[in-house]
From Swiss-Prot:
Function summary: Component of the ubiquinol-cytochrome c reductase complex (complex III or cytochrome b-c1 complex) that is part of the mitochondrial respiratory chain. The b-c1 complex mediates electron transfer from ubiquinol to cytochrome c. Contributes to the generation of a proton gradient across the mitochondrial membrane that is then used for ATP synthesis.
Similarity remark: Belongs to the cytochrome b family.
Name of the protein in its database record: Cytochrome b
Residue ranges of the TM segments: 33-53, 77-98, 113-133, 178-198, 226-246, 288-308, 320-340, 347-367
Membrane topology: Multi-pass membrane protein
Superkingdom of the organism of origin: Eukaryota
Subunit structure, as described in the record: The cytochrome bc1 complex contains 11 subunits: 3 respiratory subunits (MT-CYB, CYC1 and UQCRFS1), 2 core proteins (UQCRC1 and UQCRC2) and 6 low-molecular weight proteins (UQCRH/QCR6, UQCRB/QCR7, UQCRQ/QCR8, UQCR10/QCR9, UQCR11/QCR10 and a cleavage product of UQCRFS1). This cytochrome bc1 complex then forms a dimer.
GO biological process assignments: mitochondrial electron transport, ubiquinol to cytochrome c
Alphabetical list of CDD domains matching this protein: cytochrome_b_C, Cytochrome_b_N
Chain segments annotated as coiled-coil in the UniProt record: none
Residues given in the record as heme b b562 binding sites: H83, H182
Sites where the protein binds a ubiquinone: H201
Listed cofactors: heme b
Amino acid sequence: MINIQKTHPLLKIVNNAFIDLPAPSNISSWWNFGSLLGICLILQILTGLFLAMHYTADTTTAFSSVTHICRDVNYGWIIRYMHANGASMFFICLFMHVGRGLYYGSYAYTETWNIGVILLFATMATAFMGYVLPWGQMSFWGATVITNLLSAIPYIGTNLVEWIWGGFSVDKATLTRFFAFHFIFPFIIAALAMVHLLFLHETGSNNPTGISSDADKIPFHPYYTIKDILGVLLLILALMILVLFSPDLLGDPDNYTPANPLNTPPHIKPEWYFLFAYAILRSIPNKLGGVLALVLSILILVLMPLLHTSKQRSMMFRPISQCLFWILVADLLTLTWIGGQPVEHPYIIIGQLASIMYFLLILVLMPMASTIENNLLKW
């Protein structure tokens, strides 16, 4: 009897991607985050769709429409908080996923890696535009500050900012277009994720050792489907604990005040997942320099395959590189903390040192450590 899952044009694709896919036998829980990101995306699209049914993208009614969702719509409060905190879970999974790629040398698959970087940018853009939609104080001023950064671009900067705003300030036109883009982007992200997967399946997955696993493969189903389901259950558990017990933990109290262009909040800061980049931006006194550092702090990931000087792919057997990797993680946590602090002593100097350390680690110290480890292998 012919197996339909192996012959049907559509089922064949699903079968080759999620069922009969040959996977390394030794991939750890760090490989769970790809599937978790997929679940996060589906969850965000579904909750977002139901929110869009009740939301109005107009400056006069946006804030009250969100209030209406939370107070009057059946289970509107849980949909809204699942969407808001789902974004936080999304970024936690993203950072873990990227960190895994850096640690185990997954960036050697350059096409997969570069599409991943594009996905990261697209997700950050989507989250930023989504944060503007409730039209609270932090929404308005966050949008004003971040879009204004583009005015640092020589010659075309000012025109570009006014073009994005659709006027001379963040207003009705800005909110409407941000809603339109925020709605369409997740579907673009989903399409890019499929391309990401397509390129990954050209080479097969990496594994913790960084050594070819062609000699020892196991089918994705049932082994990794079960493993992924466990990850999904833990993700949903964490999300629901956040949503049901402390839904506003990661939000900003200022966003419960309707947007007022005449009143600037004392501390304008983005959501927690952008704070590390915001700290790097603020650590440079020059506007254009800050914007460049901000973009490069993420774009530097594209250089990872070029900066890899080690004879080994993974950091599993490279203690010096491991040490530097965890220093980098600590540095990013420091930057995240600094990004949420006011611009005053000693936070300014800590932020500047942490920013220098960030670029120094990636561009200089880690490639040097790899070279040292290569020489140690000769002993």
